[in-house]
Amino acid sequence: MEHAATLPQTSRRPATPLTGTITVPGDKSISHRALMFAGLAVGETRISGLLEGEDVLRTAAAMRALGATVERTGPGAWRASGPGIGGLQSPDDVLDMGNSGTAARLLCGILASHDIFAVMTGDASLRRRPMRRVIDPLGATGAVFAAREGGRLPLSVRGAAEAMPLSYRLPVASAQVKSALLLAGLNARGITEIEEPEPTRDHSENMLRHFGAEVEVAAHGTGKLIRLRGQPELRGADVVVPGDPSSAAFPIVAALIVPGSRVTIGGVGLNPLRTGLFLTLREMGAAIEIVNAREAGGEPVGDLIVTASDLRAVDVPAERAPSMIDEYPILAVACAMARGSSRLRGLAELRVKESDRLAATLAMITANGVKAQVDGDDLIIEGGGARGGATVATHMDHRLAMSALVMGLATETPVTIDDARFIDTSFPGFLPLMRGIGAAIEAAA
């Protein structure tokens, strides 16, 4: 879906501290996977807390087009069932994945090992993103992909009639590539083995077990070795989706940098492979308290109490990147407001996000008066506050848009973004939620 009119927004220092108790939308990674696994399983799955952003709705539509039953039964409540492993059908029309790189890459894995033909496209942003690192290893299943230069969408896939299991070492740690290969392995006879150089988010492995697949995970050097037995009988299993820690990052940093603020965020997912930002912010002196720790749907969950804090600079090691890969733009905002010089290491992966997120993050903070530079794959930020006053080009990147609006809550003069429409891809309701705790965000004049 291509969007029409833009939606510029401006944020400024609020007159009073941010306060209140909120919840953030369901975890995007888990929501995508819940719909996909439910659409492959025999029997009904009931999903609660599903993120109903544009990206996840694309996954729901794609699974319907492939023959699964997927329907909404209430706010965040969905019901899905599938034909079983190997039972998907060729879609009647092109699969449009909108802005969702996660949906597109994971779906390539499903399509590769099913004897079906499909064509996939996306919006202008997604069509610029490289898919080669997913479709190249998937070719070893016997699937045939045809794509534009660089493996970019639109692409077609003729899935393998008899898919071969994969044995593959990821050259770069990537939960999306790993998950695509595991999804392909579901309909391959034999054992699929994937070696990752660093641990990445393990929602796919957790959900595979939840739906009845046989998956083994073992430490392997600095990373992990995952082994999946193909062609299991997946059975429907209810899923509770926790609040997305990547979405919680925005009100968390806002509460930290607006003096006097205190905000509680309920039901946030605390998977240890997703909480690198929380660890980093605590190293910076952030007052983030976890209370009511519990488990929901096989994932650790807790409530976060965040209090405004005097932040100090931090040196973030490259090996932490997989656990916070989506949070670097908002971390850059926190570093800009901190005392001292911060260095965020090993950010090459940001260059192939919705935008060149490394270059765009640098442009966002420097345009607003922050001294910063890219050194190789590292981002160096001189803290001490930001002047503000700039209009930030969001490049159709939802996380960049939200980060810039949070930054404007603590700058000397307001910050404007050129377009807030794409925020709904991951965080529907972001603007009213932030206004509800006292954030001064309004339509740009």
UniProtKB/Swiss-Prot annotation:
It catalyses: 3-phosphoshikimate + phosphoenolpyruvate = 5-O-(1-carboxyvinyl)-3-phosphoshikimate + phosphate. Catalyzes the transfer of the enolpyruvyl moiety of phosphoenolpyruvate (PEP) to the 5-hydroxyl of shikimate-3-phosphate (S3P) to produce enolpyruvyl shikimate-3-phosphate and inorganic phosphate. It is found in: Cytoplasm. Belongs to the EPSP synthase family. Pathway: Metabolic intermediate biosynthesis; chorismate biosynthesis; chorismate from D-erythrose 4-phosphate and phosphoenolpyruvate: step 6/7. Its main location: cytoplasm. The gene is aroA. One of its GO terms (cellular component) is cytoplasm. One of its GO terms (biological process) is chorismate biosynthetic process. 3-phosphoshikimate binds at residues 28-29, 33, 174, 176, 326, 353. The active site is at 326 (proton acceptor). Monomer. It holds the Pfam family EPSP_synthase. It comes from the Bacteria. It is an enzyme of class 2 (transferase). Phosphoenolpyruvate binds at residues 28, 101, 129, 176, 357, 399. Its EC number is 2.5.1.19. Keywords: Amino-acid biosynthesis, Aromatic amino acid biosynthesis, Cytoplasm, Transferase. Gene3D superfamilies: Enolpyruvate transferase domain. Residues 1-24 are annotated as: Disordered. This is 3-phosphoshikimate 1-carboxyvinyltransferase. Signal peptide: none annotated. CDD domains: EPSP_synthase. Residues 7-22 have a biased composition (Polar residues). One of its GO terms (molecular function) is 3-phosphoshikimate 1-carboxyvinyltransferase activity.
